[in-house]
């Protein structure tokens, strides 16, 4: 067999492994398709629907996310014919993109063997339910797009018109940022690699600088579109939502929830711990020969993998909330370096892979064997989700045209299941409690004789989001209790 034929055979074999990793990611998510949509999924979907029905984004419906995420949810809702449950199919698709992109990055910078192992590892750890890998959250979606941007950038060197490729990588990096503010990891990893190339490799300096400018130009196109929409719909509201609010209430710079970091970190240790150890070995393999490369004025492309872990760690820390799905930001870059480590494991590769994945598979299996009613509770300790669809079903059976529902204080997925546009902007508990003027707006909404909701589904005590007692007073004076669904109490407005 000739050299060309061997290369073709090896490439095909690598694609088989990548396909296996992608299939694993789908199978890992398949059981969770029957679990209720999460608070975030339902909230994003309800806001996207309200926006498509004429509500003004960041005024009538509010979320601390850039517009790109809501555009995606609007598009998916249209394509799916308004199916709420189908949002999990979107999660599967982006999970496949993440696995394939991670493997292609590794193949380009570290070889086919490392790429094969990275695909399998990423297919499992990025889909684990205890890190909410099954849900269509911003970390999974933006991470997949960011990884695709890295693929385009590392492939640019040997391509015709490489600056166009880097421009495209910048576009993808911008799209990742438009989906989630923490989506900068792929973009900054490539820019860091280009800066190092420019600093260490004199012969590559001009090319690296041009490539960086092309990437920033691509990024600039996306940012310009976001800012144009912001200017047309309300610049101050947009800036407050996507930057100002989080900087003041919960980020790495203010209100970081370190207790939650310890709580969710327990699950990350089980699912990502062994992968992180292997990734450390992979990083040593990449970094060890750097001194000789630097002396020769060269910089291996595999350095991108180390930079990716560093930038993803930064993205994880910036959020400040440290929810379980934050850890998904680390799944792909850790898998990439773990693939490098396994490619150097000799005849112990299979044993190492088994040791790597058994903890993640074991805790995922514990979630999967539960009933449909307990899937969300086991996966994310979310006891609201199993009730959201029941509340929505009751509301749809009893409402008349023009009547609406308010969820007190918050359980955003109920709006998505009920196909009910929110009448109050804030759908998450932390915003109801902490957003500027949110409690006064809630009191005005519930007390308005014309706009007040016909039904209120009380998930939390009113005093939890309104310590002043005004909401409690409105419930006593203007509403009557009509039923209970689990622990949720449903009130109807009295004539």
Q: Model-flagged regions — what are they?
A:
Residues 171, 380-434, 440-467:
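Short periplasmic/luminal acceptor-recognition loop of GT-C membrane glycosyltransferases, typified by
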Residues 89-110, 117, 124, 148:
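Transmembrane-helix motifs of polytopic, lipid-linked glycan transferases
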Residues 3-4, 186-220, 284-294, 336:
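Perimembrane helix-loop-helix junctions
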Residues 185, 313, 319-352:
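Hydrophobic/aromatic-rich transmembrane helices and adjacent perimembrane loops
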Residues 155-174, 204-213, 300-310:
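Short hydrophobic alpha-helices at membrane interfaces in multi-pass membrane enzymes
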Residues 216-220, 343-369:
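Signature aromatic-anchored transmembrane alpha helix within multi-pass, membrane-resident enzymes
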Residues 7, 149-168, 195-202, 274-296, ...:
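Membrane-interface transmembrane helices that cradle and orient dolichyl/undecaprenyl
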Residues 26, 164-181, 187-192, 221, ...:
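Membrane-interface alpha helices of multi-pass inner-membrane proteins
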